[in-house]
Swiss-Prot record:
It comes from Arabidopsis thaliana (Mouse-ear cress). This is Putative CCR4-associated factor 1 homolog 8. PANTHER family: CCR4-NOT TRANSCRIPTION COMPLEX SUBUNIT (PTHR10797). Component of the CCR4-NOT complex, at least composed of CRR4 and CAF1 proteins. Its EC number is 3.1.13.4. Gene3D superfamilies: Ribonuclease H-like superfamily/Ribonuclease H. It catalyses: Exonucleolytic cleavage of poly(A) to 5'-AMP. Ubiquitous transcription factor required for a diverse set of processes. It is a component of the CCR4 complex involved in the control of gene expression. Pfam families: CAF1. One of its GO terms (molecular function) is poly(A)-specific ribonuclease activity. A divalent metal cation binds at D17, E19, D133, N204. Keywords: Cytoplasm, Exonuclease, Hydrolase, Metal-binding, Nuclease, Nucleus, RNA-binding, Transcription, Transcription regulation.
């Protein structure tokens, strides 16, 4: 944690990615945004975070450090989507090892919260298709269930986290790009390659940081208008 604290003094952007047991309630294709939010909060409130990736970087894309934090809270009897758990296993996540060697969610977020408060920096959070990422982050920092409506959720995010940018939303607003592009495809548009393994939080968020800086370079006005709204909550989480 001391290394993260040192980086916070020089880097105010944090790209995040999470790995979790996926959605616990299916959302219909034509559900309203509020219904999608209710399904997301149902899953996030009942499931436990497995892994969190953090990449601290600056506006020019210089990376201060990348961390992949494994949490020990997720156990064999906890709520899960079995297909998603098998997917994570196939992509190299050793859930037993994470359970044995990981750290507690509450302890990490408590320390991280006070670290951010101590540095007094205006942190900008960056995600890719990140409604669930932000929901788990908010839950971790507050230690509470998610707000009962999407409007209250957005207000809580603004109050607790401040500026949040979703790279997928940004891509949809940039000429020549599209919100339909996945992270890997978007990275290739800028000649960037992934470091590490896909579907691991650390690798995902480091790639998000690199692409964000590339997108921001020709479109610096994005930062003048404050944080973008979170992407409309999808019916199915991408883990």
């Amino acid at each position: 944690m001391s290394l993260i604290e040192d980086c916070l003094r020089s880097y105010r952007f944090i790209a995040i990615d999470t790995e979790f047991p996926s959605t616990l309630r299916e959302t219909t294709q034509h559900a309203t945004d509020e219904e999608r939010y209710m399904d997301m909060s149902f899953s996030v409130d009942r499931a436990k975070l497995i892994q969190l990736g953090l990449t601290l970087f600056d506006i020019n894309g210089r990376i201060g450090g990348t961390w992949e934090i494994n949490f020990s809270d997720f156990g064999v009897d906890d709520a899960r989507n079995e297909k998603s758990i098998e997917f994570l296993r196939r992509n190299g996540l050793d859930l037993r090892k994470i359970r044995e060697e990981g750290i507690r969610i509450e302890g990490f977020f408590s320390e991280m919260f006070w670290m951010l408060k101590k540095t007094r920096r205006n942190i900008t959070w960056v995600t890719f298709h990140g409604s669930y990422d932000i929901a788990y982050l908010l839950k971790g920092f507050t230690g509470e269930a998610l707000p009962v409506t999407s409007e209250r959720f957005s207000k809580a995010v603004a109050r607790v986290l401040g500026s949040v940018y979703d790279l997928k939303v940004m891509a949809g607003r940039c000429e020549g790009l599209s919100s339909r592009l996945g992270l890997e495809t978007l990275a290739h548009e800028f000649g960037l390659n992934r470091v590490g393994t896909a579907h691991h939080a650390g690798s995902n968020n480091e790639l998000t940081a690199m692409v964000f800086a590339k997108v921001l370079s020709p479109f610096p006005l994005f930062l003048r208008f404050g944080s973008l709204e979170l992407r409309t909550i999808e019916s199915e989480a991408i883990v």
